[in-house]
């Protein structure tokens, strides 16, 4: 309801003062995106007994907020008197919700209820869960979850999806391959991952949790009683928050592991998927060492997990138990951070999905990707004082803009910093030791190093200067992209191979994944030698190919601009050359082939289509691309069917995990001179 009365206009003027406070907070204090929360009590409005909730955040940092806030009001049976929404130039949205006692006579203590609503606002900001948790088979369909319970439900479902197969098989097949070949190990690992993905879908997990909502609530209460901050607890029932009263009353929590086990065995078939899913939920509870779930001002929800409970020593997929795991979930993303020792460093990677299908694939593999990146980083860091770590964030489908990724990165960093504040009374710390994380740039985060460094400073972190490598020299750092530290490492291997094989003056046809917009891809182009002729480039925008050779000056122009290959001047292509955008549909190519889907063509070009358009490729330097892009399902495409030789004589794996280990061995056996990722880009680690 928008009002133009003089009284309301005066209130709007008062909002300007609030906005000034928010601007100062965004500049000098911790939270920069929101939400900013303020409760104006009835003492300021005695004449009409009016209460006011003021909620502000930056546009685009969450979704469906107004709808969700109204659901929150409905849950507490609160009626609004009027609502104002004001927008400001910085993209700031400011909601003013007005309530009167006359409209809410049925509420015993309106002040307490509104205070509770304000506390739970950050939950709907962090996790905009629009639909109610409903299962047609649910016998308790009239049992309504609280906002906190809904959030716990959503978070638990995400955790279970990623970790459930590790919880199912304590052996994980490790004994089967103890004395076997790497090829057999990779095949078994692949089948195990497929089994997990086909057996436990997101929908199945959500349906099972919905079917046993009361059990989920019992586990939530166990979680809440463990992690509810003591500063928020009080024996005075009038001072207790409504959420804490709900935790203490109603459904009883589980008081012991034995009680949970007995309940599960009595109510669930131990041969059913339900049994394993609910066991996994209990394991999630047990593994949480600290969380910001009950901190009011949060941008995302973070958990520090005990890795010994979620990774097993005898694991085929995970050969070592990490030192620490963080799990973060926000409005537009979720992610992990894995490190192998207390003091460890590694980059943070943001994964974007340009189609629903690619999102599902990225979702299925992101935990394995994060683990393998951290594990590889640990091996690369063996000659320096810091061990290895890595973080991977997966953006929700549809969120691919630069601003969306920056917002997600801010939330990821902020929520982890929340629970690095040692001995803070705002959360319960079951770990009990001080810990510091050290980040670095990776895919889609290189431009955020300065931002995150200054953000840590604004949060009051004493270690802010060492928080990230790759920051600008003005902050005491060495920008990785500017000085090309990883690129120089990769190029050294490429040029050394040329020298060893006597190819330094020989014309070589080169293919590259990872385009001129990326750190590694752009520098690889700028550092390329005169004897290299680019015949193909694949990046996030599409596929650029010319068997006669791409224009090197044009590629350098794009690399200096950090532009994607869709900006390439196509008038410079030969008659055989072409560019296919990921947005293209039903495009006819010079050889007569029709590309029905540009995204699928891009994703499969490095394998299925590469040799159809480029019969000769002498050098392949992956500078980007998804993990396991060359795997057991497509390795035969890289081998000559008649001779058994590798179709590409030289591969220097600049991108991490691009080729699976068994395929590396097959390519080497087929005569390929191959430098694996941990060797090719290790120079960047050492110099950074």
Feature map (PLM): residue ranges:
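Non-transmembrane, aqueous-exposed alpha-helical and coiled segments at domain scale
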Residues: 401, 497-509, 528-531, 547-558, ...
